[in-house]
Amino acid sequence: MIDKVYDSPAAAVADIPNGASVAIAGFGLSHRFPSSLVVALRDQGATDLTVYCNGLGSQGAETAQLLAENEQISNLVASFSSRPGPPTIAEEQIVAGKLTFEVVPQGILVERMRAGGAGIAGFYTEVGAGTAVAEGKDVRYFDGKPHILERAITTDYAILRGYRADRFGNVQFRGGSRNFNDSFAKAARVAIIEVEEILDVGELAPEDIDLPGVFIS
C-alpha cells in the first residue's frame, strides 16, 4: 500500500512549477488555512500562479496573502478580495494592474470545482444573472428566469488542511474545513493536505473518512 506522507511541507510542494494553477482551501480570516503548506510554497518561490480560493485571508497571518505579498500570484479567482480596513497588498496589486482578479460567488466557486471533479463541463444558475458576474456569459431561460452558464474549474494543484489522515491519504475534516476541501481536492490533478494527526492505515474508521485517499497525492 502506498505511503503518501511527505517528510516536510517543503517536500510536499517542491514540484509546483511556475505558472501552475493552485486551489487553496480555507475559510474566514485564517481559519483552517493550510498554513504550513502556504509558507512552504512562499519559500519555494513558484511564480506566475493562478490561485483559486474563497479569499486570501487576513494580512499578516499565514494565509494565501503571503503569496500575494511575495508577488507570486498573477491571477486570482476568489469570492472576495477586500475586507474593512487598510488595503491589502493583493488589493493594491489588483488596482495597479499587476494582478488580474475574477470574483465568483462563494457557492458558485465550490460548485464549479465540484463540477470539475465530476467531469461536468458546466452548469446554468440564477446566481449572478443580471449583474456584472454575468458579463460575457451565455444566458438561457428556465421557467421564465434567466440563468447564466458557469464553466467547471479544474486545477493543477490543491493545497488543503484536514483534521486527521492515515498514511494512505484517507482524510477526516472537522468544522468549517468541510466547506471547500472536498470539492477543491477532486478538481485538482494533485491534491496535497496537511493534518493535525497522522494515523496508520486502519486506525481511521470508515464512517469518519470524509475524503477517500484516492483523491490525495
Model regions: which residues?
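Conserved alpha/beta enzyme-core scaffold
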Residues: 1-217
